[in-house]
């Protein structure tokens, strides 16, 4: 079973709201957020956040976190396993970027880049969510650098396949890679050109792209 098959146990049917679709990719005010949640009581015990301007937040208050983010006019909220962990406990108003799912895509030879068990980041100071925010920031910078090293054709392939998947859309918006929805018809040509020696020329790529874009 592939890494993506393990990460994506279900098919995502993401509906993108019109306000997010219209978001200016040049507006890049970002904050990094991490929570410490009790394993038994499933309650938030601590919250850490780090804004693009260097300001940090460290207390277990959703209300105070919202104020901190609003003061920074935050557009993007980034974290490690943010979408399927932290966002379940927090009411986050922003475009979400999750570094967890980008890692196997951009670092295929070391897919658990900067990761440890339970899908959390290694931290010099364990159980310190602010420190985890710093690590998430470092990982995002690495992922952006890796993205920029990809060929233009490969970036097109990843964007066309993944831009409507919630685990990837925020990142693709942040780097200004979103394509028009009807551009998906071009993905077969790009894939056959990029992987011509590794894929059957008769493969039904449109069907695969529709059924399992992450797996493809």
Model feature map: region roles:
Residues 1-28, 214:
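N-terminal accessory regions of nucleic-acid-interacting proteins
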Residues 25, 39-42:
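A short catalytic or substrate-binding loop motif that flags glycine-/basic-rich loops and adjacent residues
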Residues 27-28, 94, 182:
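Sequence-level motif detector for i,i+2 pairs with an aromatic at +2
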Residues 28-38:
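Two-metal-ion RNase H-like nuclease active-site motif
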Residues 41, 50-147:
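Conserved DEDDh/DEDDy metal-dependent 3′-5′ exonuclease domain
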Residues 45-47:
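Short aromatic-glycine-enriched beta-strand elements
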Residues 79, 90, 204-216:
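Short, intrinsically disordered, charge-balanced linker/junction segments flanking boundaries
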Residues 115-194, 200-202, 206, 213:
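Acidic, Mg2+-coordinating catalytic module of metal-dependent nucleases/exonucleases
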């Amino acid at each position: 079973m592939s890494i993506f098959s393990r990460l994506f146990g279900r098919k995502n049917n993401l509906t993108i709201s019109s306000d997010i679709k219209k978001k200016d990719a040049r507006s890049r005010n970002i904050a990094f957020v991490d929570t410490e949640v009790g394993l038994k009581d499933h309650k938030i015990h601590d919250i850490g956040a780090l804004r693009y301007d260097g300001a940090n937040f460290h207390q277990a208050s959703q209300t105070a976190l919202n104020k901190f983010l609003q003061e920074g006019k935050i557009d993007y909220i980034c974290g490690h396993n943010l979408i399927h962990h932290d966002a379940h406990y927090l009411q986050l108003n922003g475009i979400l970027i999750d570094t967890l799912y980008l890692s196997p895509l951009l670092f295929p030879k070391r897919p658990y880049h900067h990761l440890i068990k339970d899908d959390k980041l290694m931290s010099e100071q364990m159980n310190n969510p602010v420190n985890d925010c710093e690590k998430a920031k470092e990982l995002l910078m690495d992922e952006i650098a890796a993205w920029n090293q990809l060929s233009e054709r490969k970036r097109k392939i990843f964007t066309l396949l993944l831009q409507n998947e919630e685990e990837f859309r925020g990142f693709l918006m942040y780097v200004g890679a979103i394509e028009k929805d009807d551009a998906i018809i071009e993905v077969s040509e790009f894939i056959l050109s990029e992987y011509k020696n590794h894929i059957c020329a008769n493969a039904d790529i449109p069907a695969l792209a529709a059924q399992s874009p992450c797996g493809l």
